[in-house]
């Protein structure tokens, strides 16, 4: 995890729009890269690729029913790069009759594109889409995937459904949509595949202590307490745990740099 300084400063533009469903003002931060945007007043999911902002779906929810721990519009730095939180969704899986919900945050940088933060019961992961495919080995039990010389063991597979959304997304998000998610772990990292129809997306997450997320985004108060042990949470006895904490400590330095690219 790099602790180098941020990218050269830039002045991101913000586009103002109005919801065709209720007329409320909308703010578009990722421009042409946004595929859908959600009105937080009438809960219409809109086609951001259509100049008319065609309504794709409406869902019933209270805006404050599941408020993001990191508010939309918050800016921070991860791996030496500044990002803005532009989207938020709640997803749920059902395992042996029990529902488990977690939160995902869409982050955007106009030069670097998108990355994601996930949170479940106080456990956080910094996640990015893989640009090359891992090697899957289904001939062993449990199955494994290999990526950049590291082997990840299958943890679980379940159908994950989206139940709440806010902000903008680089895909056509829908409340009620579902896909099959498989997790393969090698703490502190996890590789996940999401299968929807014939499309498969692979991503890699790295476990991050909540306190480092709070420092990175200059959030008030304390992060939620961790409950239980997460699938890719590193053991405190492992040497690489210290390396993770030291790497993320560099974020604090980045935030104090006068050349912070978001102003």
Cite the ranges covered by each PLM segment.
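Short acidic-hydrophobic catalytic motif
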Residues: 85
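Short, acidic/hydrophobic/Gly-rich beta-strand patch recurrent on exposed beta strands
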Residues: 106-108
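Mixed-charge, low-complexity intrinsically disordered regions
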Residues: 1-78, 88-91, 95-103, 112-263
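Extended, Lys/Arg-enriched charged tracts that mediate electrostatic binding to polyanionic substrates
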Residues: 81-82
């Amino acid at each position: 995890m790099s602790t180098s300084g941020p990218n050269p400063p830039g002045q991101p533009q913000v586009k103002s729009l109005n919801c065709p469903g209720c007329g409320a003002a909308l703010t578009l931060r990722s421009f042409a890269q946004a595929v859908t945007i959600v009105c937080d007043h009438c809960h219409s999911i809109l086609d951001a690729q259509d100049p008319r902002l065609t309504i794709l779906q409406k869902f019933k929810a209270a805006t404050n029913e599941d408020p993001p721990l990191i508010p939309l519009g918050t800016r921070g730095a991860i791996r030496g790069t500044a990002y803005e939180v532009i989207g938020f969704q709640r997803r749920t899986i059902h395992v042996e009759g029990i529902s488990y919900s977690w939160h995902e945050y869409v982050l955007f940088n106009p030069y670097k594109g998108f990355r994601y933060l996930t949170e479940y019961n106080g456990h956080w992961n910094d996640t990015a889409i893989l640009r090359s495919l891992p090697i899957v080995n289904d001939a062993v039990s449990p199955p494994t995937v290999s990526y950049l010389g590291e082997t990840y063991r299958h943890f679980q597979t379940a159908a994950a459904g989206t139940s709440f959304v806010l902000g903008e997304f680089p895909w056509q998000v829908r409340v009620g949509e579902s896909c099959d998610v498989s997790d393969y772990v090698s703490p502190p990292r996890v590789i996940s595949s999401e299968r929807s129809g014939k499309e498969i997306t692979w991503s890699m997450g790295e476990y991050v202590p909540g306190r480092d997320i709070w420092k990175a985004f200059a959030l008030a108060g304390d992060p939620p307490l961790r409950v239980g042990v997460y699938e890719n949470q590193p053991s405190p006895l492992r040497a690489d745990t210290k390396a993770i904490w030291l790497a993320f400590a560099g974020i604090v330095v980045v935030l104090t740099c006068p050349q912070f690219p978001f102003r």
